Amino acid sequence: MSNEAANVQVLKEAYRRWNESHGGSVDYWFESVFGADISFGSLPRGVAPVEFARQYRDRVQLRQYFDGLLADWSMKYYTVDEYVAQGDMVVARGSCSWTFKKTGKVAETPKIDFWRFKDGKAVEFYEYFDTAAVFAATT
């Protein structure tokens, strides 16, 4: 299996677990996907009301992303329909739907995740999604 195919397989299993557990597989991501050093970023860049969706530079801080996400939001689904791999990079394209717990409103959005791997572990991540839909669900 090529490195590209192996990286895609790592993500397929992680996203499968993420969707099926409705966000309950955080430990799996840390054990099986994230490298010792990871740069993890998100399109909102920490803007309220999704302060947790910002840049993280290490695994200890990265727990704050998942803690914030799961404290405020409840996953309805998270699917990846397509993977594009080239060299050490993988792009995952799909969609997701989350309910903001304080308002009960749903944010449904296309989702693009960019990944870079080194030695079978993710060392870089950046996520893109419809921030207008997410912000609207919080009001």
Summary of predicted features, one role per range:
Residues 1-6, 67-139:
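A beta-strand edge to alpha-helix "cap/lid" segment located at domain peripheries
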Residues 11, 26-30, 38, 62, ...:
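Hydrophobic pocket/interface hotspot
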Residues 28-87:
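A solvent-exposed, acidic/Ser-Thr-rich amphipathic alpha-helical stretch
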Residues 1-15, 51-61, 108-109:
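Charged, low-complexity, helix/coiled-coil-prone segments
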Residues 21-24, 60, 106:
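Residue-level recognition of alpha-helix initiation/capping sites
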